[in-house]
């Protein structure tokens, strides 16, 4: 696991990666507010389109998509 992360970090510009993750979690965390989530998805779509060109990030994003909504739903 540690080896997989280090290999992908070498290929990724760290700034772009963390900005994309930030936009992604902002969009998921404000599911209850439709107007805000539409704005956040616009930013997220641009960043994900950049990240999907990098090998390995599709798996990371898929894991976030699957895990995060369950955490949000469990709070209500």
From Swiss-Prot:
What membrane topology does the annotation report for this chain? Single-pass membrane protein
Q: Which Pfam families match?
A: YmcE_antitoxin
Q: Which GO terms describe its cellular component?
A: plasma membrane
Q: Which UniProt keywords apply?
A: Cell membrane, Membrane, Transmembrane, Transmembrane helix
Q: Where in the cell is it found?
A: Cell membrane
Q: Which domain of life is it from?
A: Bacteria
Bilayer-crossing residues are 12-32
The primary site where this protein sits is membrane
Q: What is this protein called?
A: Uncharacterized protein YmcE
Native species: Escherichia coli O157:H7
